[in-house]
Amino acid sequence: MIIRAGKEIDLARILQIEKRAFPNSAWSKEMIHNELLERSDRKTWVIESKKELIGYCMIQFGPEEVHLINMAVEPSFQKMGLGRKLLHYFLDTNAPNTSIFLEVKRGNFPAINLYLNAGFEEITIRQKYYTEGEDAIIMCLKV
């Protein structure tokens, strides 16, 4: 497994994973392009297996906190610990001495468990946060 910074050439594959992982609420190509290439306060990490991009996480860096804004693993590679590996890489290398926030769908139990096991705590519920009306759990990891 290799984890590296995302590049423009990764855009199509990230979009493909996004649509497979979140079929009812996938980000658009424009949104992913903006996060990957246009914003200086953003960073995208990708994970590869045998030179195939199989997951990514997108981070927003603020002056006092970091926000994990999107993360997905190709569905056929889920339940192999790759999301955990990617999350811990991000935590170990990019988020020293700062609080990290994220939103996760209330019904996304695998992701919720991943974040709880990494030390995140549930802060509050944001009602009907997602486009399809599902609530978001706001989580925080205080470093």
Regions found by a protein language model. Give the residues of each.
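Conserved catalytic-core motifs of GNAT/GCN5-like acyltransferases
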Residues: 101-103, 116, 121-137
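Short glycine/proline-centered loop/turn elements that form peptide/ligand docking sites
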Residues: 83, 87, 108-111, 128-133
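Residue-level recognition of the GNAT/N-acetyltransferase active site
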Residues: 74, 78, 105-107
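Acetyl-CoA-dependent GNAT
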Residues: 5-76, 87-93, 142
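Extreme N-terminal starter segment of soluble prokaryotic enzymes
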Residues: 1-3
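Conserved acetyl-CoA-binding loop-helix of GNAT-fold acetyltransferases
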Residues: 79-92, 112-117
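Conserved hydrophobic/aromatic "anchor" residues
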Residues: 22, 56, 77, 114, ...
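Conserved GNAT acetyl-CoA-binding A-motif
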Residues: 93-105
